[in-house]
Amino acid sequence: MQKRNRRDVVPHPSIETGPMIKHALSVTRQADFAAWYQDVIAEADLAEESGVRGCMVIKPWGYGIWERIQTVMDAAIKDAGVQNAYFPLFIPLSFFEKEADHVDGFAKEMAVVTHHRLIADSKGKLVPDPEAKLEEPLIVRPTSETVIGAAMSRWVQSWRDLPLKVNQWANVVRWEMRTRMFLRTSEFLWQEGHTAHADRDDAMAETLRALEMYRSFAEDVLAMPVIAGEKPENERFPGAVATYSIEAMMQDGKALQAGTSHYLGTGFAEAAGIRYQDRDGGHSLCHTTSWGTSTRMIGGVIMTHGDDDGLRCPPRIAPHQIVIVPMLRDNGEDAAILDYCRDLESRLKALDAFGEPVRVLLDTGANKAQTKRWGWVKKGAPIIVEVGPRDVAGGNVAVIRRDRLYQESGKLNSAFVAKGDFIADAAATLEDIQASLYAEARERLDANIRRDVTDLAAHFSGEDRFVGWAEVQWARPTGGALDRIVEQLKALKLTMRNTPLDAAPADSACIFTGEPAVERVLIGRTY
């Protein structure tokens, strides 16, 4: 395969790769990971700040990624027999007051509506009308267990109505004090599944099914390896009996909780009155579950796959998997180039990858070809194809794989390929990019979970910015003993992430108490 070496690469030192490379971003990951993250969001045109504190505008490319997440996950949700529905944004305060642990867990984050009308005051400013105060305050949805529970209490009468499984795609509001786009915002988009069951075993099976759905989605679709496990008692969802999570390792070694699944026992059912008549004529409380994931996954994709040139978007969630950039020069050759590109676009769209038609964009915008190329590099389009007059004459295309942007020399890795050969291999190339991104992230995760740590303070202190996670053995203490451990970890800016479901059995003493350990728990810094 013949290489095309671009001359527009002006060298400067690359911390990561060694060769002299001019990267597309002004901030590198190693120099300032937090600033790099914000730079990727801006340069990849994913989102921007809005005029509302803690709320963001998700731009078309970012929302396109969310739509891809919705499309694939919605199919998985429906395959499990779950139906979509929609429930109110406003929830009466009394609904929350029925479940004390639940309201305590969310009280500090709740946005409250108290009036239903505005009037002009003596200075002409709009203020709430004192005569329009609501009889009962309404909470702007932080999560929907209470309002969906109220509906379930009407829908469930008999054992024949169970299991009842619903999901909604919606926005939620949690008044975050320290916000960061896609990771912590006062308003975010998500899906939340809610189910009711006749007994604990069926509800637990659903809880673990949802967890496995999230694990599979993260790894197979987002190319983001995760650890699935149960949350310690102090990290449980408010009011839950058990909470499970998937935890992903970002490139700075911090953990990102990317999805959760909760077994709620009968507490929420009792508060909402979700009862059913069993086969013998008796009445029992339902066992309920809830599970959800959100636009936070996009933040995870950025910090798992992004590089110093922007986002690298896994093909399965890329709004456009292949972008064709015609190299036009406002002359007589342009018509032939566009015809050549349209034929290429048509033939690529006829292909399937990952069981779906290949998503192709022919970029005919007014920007110069070089500007378009680097714009798509920063957005993370998996494959960028450039076509100029020489390519038309030779029956070729110039192909850039976003996961292999540079040659070993540090020059842009743009390769001449025969047009027919590129089309024949396009679907396989997309699948190879997906696998390559996952393998890279998997290697990083596996290499940075330490299982030999005996002193957390020593391990997580010092100058090293990247320390990954520690998997340690513990006795699963409760009450005051657990509270003291949480405070010790907090002083080190650490948290317990989860107890991995596939971890080796405990065979030593608890790192915190010295008592015989019963399981292993992941410790790390987190977003």
Curated annotation (Swiss-Prot):
GO cellular component: aminoacyl-tRNA synthetase multienzyme complex; cytoplasm
Catalysed conversion reaction: tRNA(Pro) + L-proline + ATP = L-prolyl-tRNA(Pro) + AMP + diphosphate
EC number, UniProt record: 6.1.1.15
Entry-linked PROSITE patterns: AA_TRNA_LIGASE_II
Pfam family, one: tRNA-synt_2b
GO molecular function: ATP binding; proline-tRNA ligase activity
Transmembrane helix as UniProt keyword: no
Any single GO BP term: prolyl-tRNA aminoacylation
Keyword Aminoacyl-tRNA synthetase tagged: yes
Task performed by this protein: Catalyzes the attachment of proline to tRNA(Pro) in a two-step reaction: proline is first activated by ATP to form Pro-AMP and then transferred to the acceptor end of tRNA(Pro).
Family: Belongs to the class-II aminoacyl-tRNA synthetase family. ProS type 3 subfamily.
Domain notes: Consists of three domains: the N-terminal catalytic domain, the anticodon-binding domain and the C-terminal extension.
Protein name as it appears in the record: Proline--tRNA ligase
Source species: Sphingopyxis alaskensis (strain DSM 13593 / LMG 18877 / RB2256)
